[in-house]
Regions:
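Conserved catalytic/acceptor-binding region of the Class I
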Residues: 132-133, 139, 143, 147-218
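A short SAM/SAH-binding and catalytic strip from SAM-dependent methyltransferases
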Residues: 117-131, 154
């Protein structure tokens, strides 16, 4: 990884993990409002057995563990052992004894039928290889009438994305995302997430779109570095940027983000989709 602000980013896995550790406090602060929104939407109760899919570095699993109490339990599941270790460290720091991690694929869950009272995923379901299969597999491990609750990104056309990745796209053209690759906006179209939940056998399906706070507690330089570090779906586009264009892109990103900044924090706002269904 290079630290020069006008250089092309290094897209190695280690770089992303270093960035996750470097920005963990501020990233958690930025994501707190969407975590809170999903937790409130899910309505966890004391004693519940909860499964959080694509849990990454630990949210909303850690917040859910605080809500279900000592007689409840939360399992944080993800493909990345490294991110789950970050989640486990965060849970230990909070002395949560009702929290465990599980490295596994959401398409093949290592749990018996009827294991969980509640399932959640924050910004994860968009990246399932086969959402229908994953949702059916999740339904298998839910108990009768248990609820699955998801939060996904709304459209690309919103300040957080347009002010940074939109600037890059205007420079390089071509596809914003790699065809067939990970798509953060897979369920941005109204009704698309609820439709696939119904197809997977869920009942009482609901969906709504909300605009929530999405605020970075620091300067433009930080949020731009953090965005590049975690922007895996945009990597093919970012790799098309010629080396000599990066200084101009950095300048234009700063100009695009500045209207949302008060000098201490950057208030983008986030358009998200909340959806749920019952077994």
């Amino acid at each position: 990884m290079t630290s020069h602000p006008d250089s092309k980013p290094d897209w190695g896995t280690q770089y992303r993990l270093v960035a996750a550790e470097k920005w963990k406090t501020k990233s958690a602060a930025m994501g707190q409002s969407v975590t809170d929104a999903l937790v409130e939407y899910a309505q966890p109760a004391p004693g519940m057995q909860v499964l959080d899919l694509a849990s990454g570095s630990g949210e909303p699993a850690i917040s859910l563990a605080s809500r279900v109490g000592r007689h409840g339990h939360v399992t944080a599941l993800d493909l990345s052992a490294d991110l789950l270790e970050i989640a486990a460290k965060r849970a230990r720091a909070r002395e949560l004894n009702n929290f465990t991690t599980q490295q596994a694929d959401a398409h093949s869950l290592p749990f018996p039928d009827d294991s969980f009272d509640l399932a959640t995923s924050r910004f994860g379901v968009m990246f399932f290889r086969d959402p229908g299969l994953a949702f059916r597999e999740l339904r298998r491990v839910l108990r009768p009438a248990a609820r699955a609750c998801f939060l996904a990104w709304g459209p690309f056309d919103q300040p957080y994305w347009q002010s940074m990745m939109g600037v890059v796209h205007r420079h390089v053209g071509g596809p914003l995302l790699q065809p067939g690759g990970p798509d953060p906006f897979r369920f941005a179209a109204p009704g698309s997430l609820s439709e696939i939940l119904r197809s997977a056998g869920y009942n009482a399906v609901e969906e709504e779109t909300k605009t929530l706070p999405w605020t970075w507690p620091g300067p433009v330089e930080e949020v731009w570095e953090q965005a590049q570090a975690v922007a895996v779906p945009f990597r093919p586009m970012l790799e098309r940027v010629p080396e000599d264009q990066w200084p101009q892109i950095h300048a234009e990103v700063h100009a695009a983000v500045r209207p949302y900044s008060d000098g201490e924090k950057i208030a983008f706002g986030a358009s998200v989709v909340l959806a749920s269904g019952k077994k």
